[in-house]
């Protein structure tokens, strides 16, 4: 038996000097060390009756749940580069094993098959070779006609034209994406916050390949795979990291469904209460119930209301004390007018579709404390704000852990979810779904959570706040240079916006389309004024990308017809 250290990038294999040649008694342990000089994967092999019980090198560790097959197997752990060459230690415990007993499932053997690792390396190399050619450029003349036909077909089959002529070619590089007309854009909207690692990210592709060899395309409430458990445990651990009590999690296929489940939980808990409190300009999703909650009358045109909603004014960053006082006064008026009728208070910690207005600890505490006192469940909608501030959740960023009864996430998490407290746990079978998510969504969701952590996105001086500060500084400079075209910046963390021109929708859309043609993707939000917003991908955005975005914005403002 030996501990092998393999260099994934070069294919060179290096074994430790000390080779353990024979198995020990059942329950005995042996250790082996190897000094690391570059990023590697560590694996144990050739041990017919042992399992790897501990594998450590400073802050990284192997997964002890993955045991070796008789005679052959791998247990891997990513090891970062350290200039002082740390030592990896593997401790192996010998276990009793009958001839017909296996420490792995057949599926584990498939996942650990070296041929799959080789296939993933080949795919990554091929994508990298082709994606390296991508940089912002206009459409290819030879592809324009066919692309226009595709857009016409899309418009016909969906019953109306898309907001902009976007059909991806299927290839990208970080925040850069190639369209089917050969043009390349700097994507700083990312599906309105979905593509947190950008496009064609190697880690996300590898996770999707792992999902592709699973037994089903979809997971559900009745039948699901272990990755669902891992995803739910990761989300609840993140949510409870600073004091919130949110031990339960239900996966779902969209942010709207996550919000539907949140309201079901709250209304079930507070029955017969039937009213909901929300903020002006709230956006909760496109389902029937969420259209009622959303404060956009044109989004529910011709649709009956499903439950009564009362709206509070959101925090005004220009007048925080006065707007807080107005919101609190209105809250007390409504609680007095409808005693015992409120089933939930639904809130985005950072108003997204409403115009990228940030909340604050003081503002939300002034509202949430009387709501807690009145026994009204508090729902934080983090479908757009998750992963974009100094903490994984914006409610943590604002220090609101004590008030979180139910929290929803989505978009960047790839699979959406509703987290809730023990007190909110339903007493009846009101929560169930045929689909909890695609197998690939769950696998890439786990990869995304890992990437956000490994990219040092969080913390007061983390990547999110650094990139956000740089982006806002660049927008502030443009506001000085083009005072009639740019007001702002606005937002919080990696949710950044500015008000273009007179703040009208028509002007904002005109500039948005002009930026699209130049090669920068942003999107409108808000209503009065209408703003242009950006959601850079946190797991891949660098200072060079921020600088390029400001350069393209400058070009767009200077050449706006």
Predicted regions and their residues:
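Short linear motifs in low-complexity or flexible loops
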Residues: 4, 10, 15, 21-23, ...
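Low-complexity, intrinsically disordered or signal/transmembrane-proximal segments
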Residues: 14, 30, 34-35, 49, ...
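Generic detector of N-terminal low-structure segments
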Residues: 39, 60, 70, 74, ...
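Compositionally biased low-complexity segments enriched in histidine and/or tyrosine
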Residues: 41-43, 512
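Conserved N-terminal phosphate-binding loop of PLP-dependent enzymes in the Aspartate aminotransferase
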Residues: 84, 90-561
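Residue-identity detector for glycine
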Residues: 11, 24-27, 46, 71-73
